[in-house]
């Protein structure tokens, strides 16, 4: 029963709401860069396209095939990525990895919404 309660906490109302409201879904016609990643643990797949101007992301699109946690993460990223530099995005990525893998603090603004994923650190396959 305790494990079930923990799983319910993991898939909180906030995570489910973020997953349901994912912005920038689709693809761009002429992106400056594209990337696709697949998780070997769970099979989630994320493909992104970006257009950059003057060193900042001006357009962003994503196709996400993932569980609610992956969709919530994609939602937080997409809500905050326009206007950011590649360095800001890389810093948020590194801070998120540290939070999930070694108990570090959540990423700083504007990506502080990733804090909602902190409970996932207890579930290595997530």
Explain the meaning of each model-derived region.
Residues 73-85:
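Alpha-helical support elements that line or immediately flank enzyme active sites
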Residues 1-26, 84-126:
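C-terminal binding/interaction regions
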Residues 35, 59-66, 115-125:
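A short glycine/serine-rich beta->alpha loop
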Residues 46-47, 78-79, 88-91:
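Short, surface-exposed, polar/charged, turn-prone segments marking secondary-structure boundaries
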Residues 69-70:
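Hydrophobic alpha-helical segments that drive targeting, anchoring, or assembly
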Residues 18-64:
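Structured beta-strand/loop patches that form or line metal/cofactor-binding pockets in enzymes
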């Amino acid at each position: 029963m305790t494990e079930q309660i923990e799983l319910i906490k993991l898939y909180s109302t906030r995570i489910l709401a973020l997953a349901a409201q994912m912005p920038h879904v689709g693809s761009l016609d002429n992106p400056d860069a594209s990337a696709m990643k697949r998780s070997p643990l769970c099979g989630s797949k994320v493909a992104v396209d970006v257009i950059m101007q003057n060193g900042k992301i001006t357009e962003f699109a994503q196709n996400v095939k993932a569980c609610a946690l992956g969709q919530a993460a994609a939602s937080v990223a997409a809500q905050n990525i326009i206007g950011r530099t590649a360095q800001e995005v890389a810093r948020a990525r590194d801070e998120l990895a540290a939070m999930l893998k070694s108990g570090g603090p959540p990423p700083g603004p504007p990506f502080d919404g990733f804090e909602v994923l902190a409970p996932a650190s207890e579930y290595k396959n997530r």
